[in-house]
């Protein structure tokens, strides 16, 4: 029983951190879509991280790419499409973020390569995707990873953002290390990128 409580408290802590980041990113993305200075500032931090993740996941033009948690500034899905020429389907479960993000992609003339949909990572159909990205602000991460473990292609790659080894700890405590192998962990400013492969 004690171990179960540790799993629950660990998962709760991870999800609370992700919720806090969700609200932080809403504020930053709102500023970035309204004021070019903030967009440049945000992309100065984000772009090198996204480029590294694209390389880690070995994304090519042939891959079907799925991005969970695009927010109102879908900079990662847009960069993936621009850098690899892959088509990216991206979702957000916040209706307002989805609507603003969809309009932003349209304004940038990327609607043919970046498809923004309203959806939730805990139940979205993912079986056709080759590469799946999970943003740092996605929660409940435990339910999203369980959904992926049951429904993704066997050879799919998952690029998941986390904080201070929280994804590795969660995989251990949630008994998902039987399902996922952590292939690469990369340290970024404020975050980590985890490349997960299904065993």
Locate the predicted segments by residue.
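Conserved beta-strand signature within the Rossmann-like core of class I S-adenosyl-L-methionine
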Residues: 155-167
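Conserved SAM-binding motif I beta-strand of class I
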Residues: 87-92
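Active-site capping/gating segments
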Residues: 165-199
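Conserved SAM-binding loop
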Residues: 101-102
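Conserved SAM-binding loop of SAM-dependent methyltransferases across substrates and taxa
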Residues: 72-84
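Conserved SAM/SAH-binding beta-strand->alpha-helix loop
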Residues: 94-96
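Conserved class I S-adenosyl-L-methionine
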Residues: 62-72
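S-adenosyl-L-methionine
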Residues: 1-60
């Amino acid at each position: 029983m004690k171990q179960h409580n540790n799993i629950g408290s660990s998962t709760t802590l991870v999800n609370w951190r992700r919720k806090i980041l969700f609200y932080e990113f809403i504020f930053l993305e709102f500023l970035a879509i309204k004021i070019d200075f903030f967009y440049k500032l945000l992309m100065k931090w984000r772009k090198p991280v996204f480029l590294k993740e694209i390389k880690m996941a070995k994304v090519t033009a042939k891959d079907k790419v799925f991005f969970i948690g695009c927010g109102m500034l879908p900079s990662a899905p847009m960069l993936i499409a621009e850098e690899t020429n892959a088509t990216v389907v991206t979702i957000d479960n916040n209706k307002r973020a989805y609507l603003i993000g969809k309009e932003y992609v349209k304004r940038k003339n990327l609607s043919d390569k970046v498809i923004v949909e309203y959806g939730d990572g805990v139940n979205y159909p993912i079986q056709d995707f080759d590469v799946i990205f999970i943003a740092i602000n996605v929660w409940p991460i435990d339910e999203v990873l369980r959904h992926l473990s049951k429904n993704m292609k066997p050879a799919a790659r998952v690029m998941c953002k986390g904080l201070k080894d929280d994804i590795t700890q969660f995989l251990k405590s949630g008994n998902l290390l039987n399902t996922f192998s952590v292939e690469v962990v990369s340290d970024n400013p404020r975050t980590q990128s985890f490349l997960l492969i299904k065993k």
